Design a protein with these regions (language model features):
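A broadly conserved sequence feature marking short terminus-proximal activation segments
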Residues: 1-5
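A detector for small-residue-rich transmembrane helices and their helix-helix packing motifs
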Residues: 7-23, 27-205
Length: 205
């Protein structure tokens, strides 16, 4: 039950120390409003990620299924890595990013939406597994709020750079450096989570 606690002690949302539910700051880590207006216990019941990881994976799966439905009979085409793949048109309409959507059609918002879309069964399977493994760990180490910021900023940055490379670096002889005409997937946010873990490990020894 999502219930507000008005008296007693709660666990600080940042450091895990016991604090008064109405304390202005945590005596251990200095966080302001450590009791989160009395909702800290209810929020902690959602997990270290405050339910963000299940939300991301569930939304990705739902959008993938909708993409398949919108693609009609085109989903069975191609080999193993394109098996059950939504059509390029469906991905474009749902918010795929890349040089074509961003620069040719002015769909700048796709740098935010593309990380929620996937281009095939194996694509979404591997990404969902990575998110489910990395997300809770990053949430525990950094806090749910910072984890959401890391995930979102990494996704936006990755797709923005890929789209920009597709617009300006097509002349390069190495295909991997030429960016993408159209692209989807949670790889950029996943690398953001992984980078956060690497940074935490290096900074704490």
């Amino acid at each position: 039950m999502f219930k507000r606690q008005t008296t007693g002690s709660v666990v600080c949302a940042s450091c895990g120390y016991l604090v008064g539910v109405n304390d202005a700051t945590c005596y251990n880590c200095g966080r302001r409003n450590p009791g989160l207006w009395g909702f800290a216990p209810a929020l902690r019941s959602l997990g270290k990620d405050l339910g963000f990881v299940p939300f991301v994976t569930g939304t990705c799966i739902a959008l993938y299924a909708l993409g398949l439905l919108a693609s009609g009979g085109q989903v069975m085409r191609g080999g193993l890595f394109s098996f059950l793949s939504p059509s390029a048109l469906a991905l474009f309409l749902f918010g795929a990013s890349g040089q074509t959507p961003v620069f040719d059609y002015g769909r700048w918002w796709t740098v935010l939406s593309a990380s929620w879309l996937h281009a095939g069964l194996l694509h979404i399977l591997f990404n969902v597994l990575w998110i489910r493994n990395l997300g809770p760990v990053v949430g525990e180490l950094y806090g749910a709020g910072r984890m959401v910021i890391i995930y979102t900023v990494a996704g936006v940055t990755g797709f923005a750079m890929s789209s920009l490379a597709g617009e300006t670096m097509g002349w390069l002889p190495i295909r991997a450096l030429q960016g993408a005409q159209i692209t989807v997937g949670a790889s950029a946010p996943i690398f953001g989570l992984l980078g956060a873990l690497v940074y935490y490990g290096r900074s704490t020894g």
